[in-house]
Amino acid sequence: MLKIGVVGCGAIASLITKALMSDRLNKAEVLAFYDGNLEKAEKLAMETGADFCRSLDELVSKDLDLIVECASVTAVEDTVIKSLNNGKDVIIMSVGALADKDLFLKLYKLAEKLGRKIYIPSGAIAGIDAVKSGSLGKISDVTLTTTKPVHGLKSALEEQGLNTDEIKEPKVVFEGTVFEAISKFPQNINVSVVLSLASRYPAKVKIIADPNAVVNRHEILVKGSIGTIKTCVENNPCRDNPKTSALAAYSVIRLIKDLSEPVRIGT
């Protein structure tokens, strides 16, 4: 049995937990929750029968195998460091934090030193297995074009001074590097960092706000010595959190299942 603790108790954490609870094979179980908003953690703990923790330190000190970070980019560093130092492996959902090269290296070296693992799920995009394999050759270009409903980008756009009510047709709201993208859209474009890490090449990112869109669309183009990789995924937004795709949560569930099963498919 894989014993799991969860940091961050929003819609994604709830979806992951309930999916694992419904798994008939029962090879993984969420046993404890923590959130900076204690009411959220207590509510999810009561709904699932798991432990409610009042601090991150309390959570990572428990008898757990794996910590799943579902909180925010700002929570990643503290969560991962404390988890690793307490003998736990970690899944990072807010992978945008790893656009910070210094932080990535810091966490990488700590995990290596302690003999622990940091897992980064593929998230809401397809083709990461092929991109990882292709990165063993020479990559010459990586491009991500993401189209989302305006309401899914609303908070990030308004922070940049854009009136989302004035967007009446598809509008390019960002075009630049992965580092700029995750800085301006920290809750919307984690996939750009996953893609960049998998390819070992900084992705060029374009974000389109579409008032008529009902899905989150991610188009990937990777060119290199292995040839060309093109993928396009149209994801349904998470029902309770339209900033992200339901597939992002399912990628974590699949990863947890892979960790608890004897056969793993794919790179």
Curated annotation (Swiss-Prot):
Keywords: NAD, NADP, Oxidoreductase, Pyridine nucleotide biosynthesis. The active site is at residue 218. Its EC number is 1.4.1.21. InterPro entries: Asp/hSer_DH_NAD-bd (IPR005106), Asp_DH (IPR002811), Asp_DH_arc (IPR022487), Asp_DH_prok (IPR020626), L-Asp_DH (IPR011182), NAD(P)-bd_dom_sf (IPR036291). It comes from the Archaea. It catalyses: L-aspartate + NADP(+) + H2O = oxaloacetate + NH4(+) + NADPH + H(+); L-aspartate + NAD(+) + H2O = oxaloacetate + NH4(+) + NADH + H(+). The keyword rRNA processing does not apply. GO terms for molecular function: aspartate dehydrogenase activity; NAD binding; NADP binding; oxidoreductase activity, acting on the CH-NH2 group of donors, NAD or NADP as acceptor. Pathway: Cofactor biosynthesis; NAD(+) biosynthesis; iminoaspartate from L-aspartate (dehydrogenase route): step 1/1. GO terms for biological process: NAD biosynthetic process. Specifically catalyzes the NAD or NADP-dependent dehydrogenation of L-aspartate to iminoaspartate. Belongs to the L-aspartate dehydrogenase family. The iminoaspartate product is unstable in aqueous solution and can decompose to oxaloacetate and ammonia. This is L-aspartate dehydrogenase. It comes from Methanococcus maripaludis (strain C6 / ATCC BAA-1332). The lineage of its organism: Archaea, Methanobacteriati, Methanobacteriota, Methanomada group, Methanococci.
